[in-house]
């Protein structure tokens, strides 16, 4: 028997006012009366002020049974006279069981988000951008359902404790945090990512315009994220990493570039040692910028731990970029299975007249004799004689190799056939090694 249908309409409205849009959707299938009384908007998106203003006028007149599942507001600009209209709308939407809230408003620093944004019980995904300044969170800040938080060009200040730290603390089930167009040095307060539940973290710096005076406010970054499995980190290295807890890390993608102000970086006492040690449990490691290898694994080689769990390593390379840091990484990775070279194979670029010459950093490739990798992938291979000769050295040293996968840049059929023949004729130490060639 459908007991809900026998309830008075005002009681049904009252019940629905406590439900998220998802829960209200479920109840619509339980009770026929609910189907008639409950309205659920799945997707509400606005990019223009006029259409938004008309919506707000109608929204404020809707009963509590009008629920919204996803609300997205994107405004190129907003002046002071529009603040109250936007805030009235947001407060109303937040009471309608919204699950997905996206605010992309180009605001001035004097705009303050309504406190209801930080006390919503239903929101599961929250995106804030671009240009919000979050200074103070309400004392009762709590987002009990929030699992994904995306911040785009958002700055945090610290009038009453660090607003960023408080926001993370108010999100007890947070699983994913994305901070885009990041500029730590413009924040006021700690750069401390702390969450016991966080599983995925993406930090992407907007740009690097070094202003020495800002570095006094950018002394350190810390990670206390014991459940974190995925880290995508594009930034410059601060003075240090006092706390690094990445015990559950599975995959890390690092982009820590050496920019035009590298001399300034060297003059600072920056020390990424704790970050390097904190990655010791990583299983998949990707290094996307060439000089990240030098900055982390060569300049601070003493801090490099043994990567017992590392099975897949991907590094960016160039033909004339020495493999000193790669050698250190390989020697510290006793269980590595797959090595991907994002770029060309390194060889003695400056000794083209001596095809058998081996760059000093390779030491005759002897360090490969104890390398356990089974799969070697090279994404850029032209097939000139220097590359072929150095490939011979590599294949002659890797005892466990089972697959060489090469992506060749060639268009002419005769060139493709020649490269294929050259690669297949190379002697291999491993009798199990097969060669797979992709042409582009």
Curated annotation (Swiss-Prot):
Pfam families: F-box, LRR_At5g56370. SMART domains: FBD, FBOX. Keywords: Leucine-rich repeat, Repeat. PROSITE patterns: FBOX. It comes from the Eukaryota. LRR repeats lie at residues 4-31, 126-153, 156-181, 194-205, 210-235, 264-289, 318-343. Residues 1-52 form the F-box domain. Disulfide bonds: none annotated. This is Putative F-box/LRR-repeat protein At5g15620. It comes from Arabidopsis thaliana.
């Amino acid at each position: 028997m459908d007991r809900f249908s026998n309830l008075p309409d005002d009681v049904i409205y009252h019940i629905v006012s406590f439900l998220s849009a998802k829960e209200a959707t479920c109840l619509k299938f339980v009770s026929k009366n609910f189907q008639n009384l409950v309205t659920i908007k799945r997707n509400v998106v606005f990019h223009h002020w006029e259409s938004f203003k008309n919506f707000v006028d109608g929204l404020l007149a809707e009963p509590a049974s009008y629920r919204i599942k996803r609300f997205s507001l994107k405004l190129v600009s907003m002046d002071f006279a529009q603040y109250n209209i936007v805030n009235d709308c947001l407060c109303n939407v937040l009471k309608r069981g919204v699950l997905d809230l996206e605010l992309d408003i180009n605001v001035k620093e004097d705009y303050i988000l309504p406190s209801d944004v930080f006390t919503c019980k239903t929101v599961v995904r929250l995106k804030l951008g671009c240009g919000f300044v979050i200074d103070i969170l309400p004392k009762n800040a709590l987002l009990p359902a929030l699992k994904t938080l995306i911040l785009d060009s958002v700055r945090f200040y610290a009038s009453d404790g660090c607003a960023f730290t408080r926001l993370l603390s108010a999100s007890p089930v947070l699983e994913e945090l994305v901070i885009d167009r990041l500029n730590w040095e413009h924040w006021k307060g700690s750069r401390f990512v702390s969450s016991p539940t966080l599983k995925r973290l993406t930090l992407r710096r907007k740009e690097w315009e070094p202003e020495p005076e800002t570095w006094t406010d950018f002394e350190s970054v810390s990670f206390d994220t014991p459940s974190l499995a995925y880290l995508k980190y594009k930034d410059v290295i601060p003075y240090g990493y006092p706390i690094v807890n990445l015990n559950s890390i599975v995959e890390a993608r690092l982009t820590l570039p050496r920019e035009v102000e590298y001399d300034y970086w060297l003059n600072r006492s920056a020390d990424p040692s704790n970050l390097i040690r904190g990655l010791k449990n990583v299983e998949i490691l990707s290094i996307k910028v060439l000089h990240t290898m030098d900055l982390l694994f060569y300049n601070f080689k003493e801090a490099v731990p043994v990567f017992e769990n590392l099975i897949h390593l991907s590094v960016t390379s160039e033909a004339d970029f020495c493999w000193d840091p790669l050698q250190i990484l390989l020697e510290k990775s006793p269980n590595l299975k797959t090595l991907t070279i994002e770029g060309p194979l390194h060889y003695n670029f400056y000794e083209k007249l001596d095809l058998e010459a081996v760059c000093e950093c390779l030491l005759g490739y002897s360090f490969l004799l104890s390398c356990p990798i089974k799969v070697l992938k090279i994404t850029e291979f032209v097939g000139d004689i220097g590359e072929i000769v150095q490939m011979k050295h590599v294949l002659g040293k890797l005892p466990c190799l089972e697959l060489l996968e090469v992506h060749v840049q060639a268009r002419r059929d005769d060139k493709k056939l020649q490269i294929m023949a050259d690669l297949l004729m190379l002697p291999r130490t491993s009798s199990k090694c097969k060669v797979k060639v992709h042409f582009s």
